[in-house]
Design a protein with these regions (language model features):
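Positively charged n-region of N-terminal signal peptides that target proteins for export
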Residues: 1-4
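Mixed-charge, low-complexity intrinsically disordered regions
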Residues: 17-78, 83-155
Length: 155
């Protein structure tokens, strides 16, 4: 159950618009932008907790979200198989691009600590981090949103 949910979480997100066919998991609008900005800010303030967890893991499925820009479009991607060294995260792009063409699923990507827009990991069936998902819950059917809310370690 955790793996399919993780794939769903890793697929969800965001920003800007374009005319091409987009993956159905790409969320371009409909969420509260101020709530999303606050979620990203909270994630960045708490990223040292994630780095500590990554260096001494008590959970699994560690991931970091990175904004990637190409031709004026910005899309957020989850990186998996994360490492952190010299103030940089490195990982594998975990979802298909929908708006940018300078990256592909399975590609290695590196980003500075301050560039991360979110982070997450699982422990004992609970999800830590993934703050950027919370503003998206209002857009989901209530049953689906309730399932995700029950998985969050923090409200």
């Amino acid at each position: 159950m955790i793996r399919p949910l993780m794939a769903s979480w890793l697929s969800l997100f965001l920003l800007c618009g374009c005319g091409q066919s987009l993956p159905e998991t790409l969320v371009k609008s409909g969420y509260d932008e101020k709530e999303m900005e606050a979620a990203i800010s909270l994630s960045q303030r708490e990223i040292d907790l994630f780095i500590t967890e990554l260096s001494q893991p008590t959970g699994n499925n560690h991931a970091v979200k990175v904004p990637i820009t190409d031709a004026g479009e910005t899309e957020h991607f989850w990186l998996t198989d994360i490492t952190f060294q010299n103030n940089e995260f490195s990982g594998i792009i975990g979802n298909e691009p929908g708006m940018v063409s300078n990256v592909k699923i399975g590609q290695t990507w590196t980003l500075k600590k301050h560039e991360a827009s979110d982070w997450m990991f699982m422990r004992d069936g609970k999800m830590y981090g993934n703050y950027t998902m919370r503003p998206l819950l209002k857009m989901m059917p209530e049953e689906e949103a309730a399932m995700y809310r029950s998985m969050f370690a923090e409200p």
